[in-house]
Amino acid sequence: MDVDQDAKENKKIKKSPAKKSPKQASVTKKPLASQSASVANVVYDSALETAPASGKQQTKKTIQKKILPKSALPKIVAAKKEPPETSEKNTPPKQSKEIPAPNLGSAEFSAIAENMAELVDQGRKALGAALGGVDGGEARSELAASVADATKTLGFVAEYWLSKPERAAVEQAHLYRGLADIWQQTLLRYSGEETPPLVIADVGDKRFASPEWQENPFFDWLRQSYLFTSRWAGDLIDKTEGLDAQTRVKAAFYTRLISSAVSPSNFVPTNPELLRATVEAKGENLVRGFRMLVEDISAGHGMLKIRQTDEDKFKLGVNMANTPGKVVWRNDVMELIQYAPTTSDVYARPLLITPPWINKFYVLDLNSEKSFVRWAVAQGLTVFIISWVNPDESKAEKGFEAYMHEGILTALDVIEQATGERKATVAGYCVGGTLLATTLAYMAATGDDRIDSVTFFATQVDFSNAGELQIFFDEERLAAMDEGMAKTGYLDGVKMANAFNMLRPNELIWTYVVDNYMKGVEPAAFDLLAWNSDCTRIPRANHSFYTRSCYVENRLARGEMVIDGVKLNLNNVKIPIYELATREDHIAPAPSVFRGAKLYGGDVTFVLGGAGHIAGVINPPSKDKYQYWTNGPVVGEYDKWVAGAKETKGSWWPHWFQWVTAQAPQKVPARQPGDGKLTPLCDAPGDYVRVKS
């Protein structure tokens, strides 16, 4: 799932320092230049031989002309000539920061040699863990499908540009001019001139935060050249004509993946911060990093499961998923949890929550300060939540129908036994909401009226423009997934987690690759990332039905989905609906949620929250963060609805609470788990949530 927004909110949490080995030298941080000075000087000397005859002044004029058009160089800043404070005769040229090369004695070389030997050994173990943990045929099948799809997709882009050489020549000229300008600016810096950068990193791009990326001309040249080339490549996708929407999204995705992977920040020789750390630690940082790499590949059963937080700091039922309650029902698909009341009176109408099964339910009960469940209980609601099973091969045939019958519909039966209430209000989140919408259409078709109001959190029912996840669900990829699931009976949770991570490669992959495996630094403790790392498996039948019926064929929106022989039509759903979308959601994009909200036959209250798929939903009022927007009925286009919407600061939770209690305002004395016809099985959060993938 997407955790990008809350990860940004976690900036103030410092990374826990790596445990130092007794062999690790104690050093002080100093500016880096000697490691790159010799390379830069050779490049500089060779470039001077081809520099314009008019020399430095001509070079400065070239920069000031701003050769590149804006479309070819986003965020370009022209260098300005500043008058010197004193004459050039009396002012020696400024030199780039340098330090003498480290003075290495025999002891240091011995430490380096030992660390390099250990590094080789850890690399061997990492390779062994990767090769030993995955079935070779299955791994090749999915990898081959991914490579084939990337090649085919980018081939369409290449075909457009190469079909007319003059068209390609124009874009090549833009690239060459931009790189030439950056190089000329670098020459000026080496000659002592203070010149501003031509290419500025995006706000929030932390890869180049170290001052040495700007202070050292060589690394500044690398940084600017990389950023310019990456943006140029992205512009090529935008300018390519004749691509359908899906192919364009995929082309941008693959281009972003490649650009992120080749960033100079990802390699020791081209990252000044990494280079310094490696020299100062004599390579021991790499040894620590490779040890973590071996552990993470082993944890992923042959696939890399990147550690994003210190999971040992969190314990279910202690400082996560700790709202008091009882498991009151268990079957092959779910455990049903009833939470203990904290008020003397409660609303008569119970609330059932159906979370997604691609992650565990406790995203809605992270801790005492970030718990939608705890907050809802405190407002006087009787809350039940489904904890989905983390399936093994024995659950391979549990499909969408089973999750509907043995999940939501069974939960309604159990709630009536526990509370005496025949009707309930139900909330669904993400794919849990898609299942809920499917269930509502089924209930409407079969005359079942036990749900009298419904809430959707970041839920799609129309998948015609379903966001970046569509990248993974074309027929070739699904066939490869089916081949793998035929052997295991499920989709491995690590694969799903890696797919979500690839949607934000800089923030959710390469940041941790650099920090964990190159710097050798353990990640900090962060509750949301701990939940995100606690991935679950998905039954083969469920995954195949959902991805094909929704993402590929869009059957629910078209009125063509059939469950148990019943054809479903969302327009038959007439009950009141509260529909929450979040503005920065890339998994369930707000325009897609808005479009789907038009398919229901009853009254829909559409609310747009700030932030993304997780942070926009889990936004407690006490945090006083973000905002939400409200407007009239769900009609017209999404952009027009947003343009006329009213913005309210803070959490949407109180707004929802007023809506949901207005549907059924009656109150009754508080009900404890076990008061009804059911005997509690165990304390919340239950057993299913503790099963690891």
Predicted regions and their residues:
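Short amphipathic alpha-helix adjacent to the substrate-entry channel of hydrolases
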Residues: 365-383
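Short beta-strand element of the alpha/beta-hydrolase
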Residues: 347-356
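Alpha/beta-hydrolase active-site loop
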Residues: 397-418
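Alpha/beta-hydrolase fold nucleophile elbow
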Residues: 418-431
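Alpha/beta-hydrolase-fold enzymes
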Residues: 240-277, 417, 421, 439-543, ...
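Short alpha-helix in the alpha/beta-hydrolase fold that links the catalytic acid
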Residues: 589-599, 610
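Short beta-strand/loop motif that positions the catalytic acidic residue
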Residues: 579-581
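Amphipathic, low-complexity, repeat-rich surface-exposed segments
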Residues: 1-333, 346-347, 384, 596, ...
